[in-house]
Amino acid sequence: MSVRIRLKRMGAKKRPYYRIVVMDSASPRDGRAIEELGYYHPVEMQNQVKINEDKFRDWIGKGAIPSDTVKRILNKNNFKVES
């Protein structure tokens, strides 16, 4: 079982927001998450990002791999994620 940290789409049509979640890599995008780590609101004036750093670091330590999109969003918001 390969675990990924990725985005889960929520919200209304044309007003999306995303939850940053830990999921099995074989799960569908909007499937059941193992744990929620934070959220990302791309529609807001200032792309709002909030993440629980302790949980994020814990999952990275357990071998979870962040998706490229999650890495880009977090690096853009001064939260350094190693490749």
Curated annotation (Swiss-Prot):
The keyword Ribonucleoprotein applies. GO terms for molecular function: structural constituent of ribosome. PROSITE patterns: RIBOSOMAL_S16 (PS00732). GO terms for cellular component: cytoplasm; small ribosomal subunit. InterPro entries: Ribosomal_bS16, Ribosomal_bS16_CS, Ribosomal_bS16_dom_sf. GO terms for biological process: translation. SUPFAM superfamilies: Ribosomal protein S16. This is Small ribosomal subunit protein bS16. It comes from Borrelia hermsii (strain HS1 / DAH). The gene is rpsP.
